Amino acid sequence: MAAAAALRAPAQSSVTFEDVAVNFSLEEWSLLNEAQRCLYRDVMLETLTLISSLGCWHGGEDEAAPSKQSTCIHIYKDQGGHSGERPYECGEYRKLFKNKSCLTEPRRDHKHRNVRTGERPYECSKYGKLFHQKPTLHIHERFHTGQKTYECSECGKSFHQSSSLLQRQTLHTRERPYECIECGKAFAEKSSLINHRKVHSGAKRYECNECGKSFAYTSSLIKHRRIHTGERPYECSECGRSFAENSSLIKHLRVHTGERPYECVECGKSFRRSSSLLQHQRVHTRERPYECSECGKSFSLRSNLIHHQRVHTGERHECGQCGKSFSRKSSLIIHLRVHTGERPYECSDCGKSFAENSSLIKHLRVHTGERPYECIDCGKSFRHSSSFRRHQRVHTGMRPYK
């Protein structure tokens, strides 16, 4: 309850249906094919359903008649629907409908009345979350089942909601009609532009009641609160590991699927994360954006700069068992396995286990026959970089040990 109150506390601006709707003129509508019209109807109905269930349209909190934006949605089903005429009026709420059936449907299924009275008769069987309308429940349930019924014909990616498909198709057409007057950045959706403007205004309206940190977006506050609650709602179905953010789960799943969607155009090497690709590309560009303020030495990775700075600060991570110290915490964690005997990395082929993941990777080459280090002078290849470096001395004549 406290979390919900914290999210509701700031005064939020009203959302009208017009803010999020896409409108067509009669001429534009006539140019659409049947599949495009069906997609448009699905998106508009879905959008109205979601806005209604949230109760956040203009006039949604008082008892006055709803505004024009919240009551009029022109979804063209045939030529007769172009007028948008709504001759049937609800006597209780003065809401207009095109079809008499919408007005006379059973009270429990009277969608607009449920929103007005606050009644939420539709319950999620998994988590018990309640909804005003049945279509909203169906949309919500797709996230539990993993059902993605809307597929993009351009790239094959599928989505839970038709509105998400429409957004994806906009990315392919590159149409970005909403431009920021401050910096000129353009967006496909009006809501994205509204969110972007907060960067310039510095507005941070959502405050954490635990630590006082404030955020521009409610979604950022929700994610942040999981630091305090320890909540990890996104669980991997393969290994049971859970995550605080859905994006982290998606990245983790690539460990199981082997998917590496980010490929380097220079050498063809692929990566699970976009950040890993960006780091790798610096090998080709020789970019070193992280510079030490003490000595001016620069690095391609921020983690390497942090590690280097300990040379100047003298900061070390000490082992409580033997007193040995390390400049990296990760090195201390690996070292502690000498004392505990822990070997968490096991070979699936022969069962041999290792204290370090890098040792397992090297061992796997015994089974796969992989020899990634090749000598450009004679073509001989090696499993380990250390063996490769020793071999190169045959060609260079270098004798480091005298």
Curated annotation (Swiss-Prot):
Pfam families: KRAB (PF01352), zf-C2H2 (PF00096). One of its GO terms (biological process) is regulation of transcription by RNA polymerase II. Keywords: DNA-binding, Metal-binding, Nucleus, Repeat, Transcription, Transcription regulation, Zinc, Zinc-finger. It comes from the Eukaryota. Residues 15-87 form the KRAB domain. A zinc finger (C2H2-type) spans 88-116, 122-144, 150-172, 178-200, 206-228, 234-256, 262-284, 290-312, 317-339, 345-367, 373-395. The keyword DNA-binding applies. GO terms for cellular component: nucleus. One of its GO terms (molecular function) is DNA-binding transcription factor activity, RNA polymerase II-specific. PANTHER family: ODD-SKIPPED - RELATED (PTHR14196), ZINC FINGER PROTEIN 208-LIKE (PTHR14196:SF12). May be involved in transcriptional regulation. This is Zinc finger protein 586. It comes from Homo sapiens (Human). The lineage of its organism: Eukaryota, Metazoa, Chordata, Craniata, Vertebrata. The gene is ZNF586.
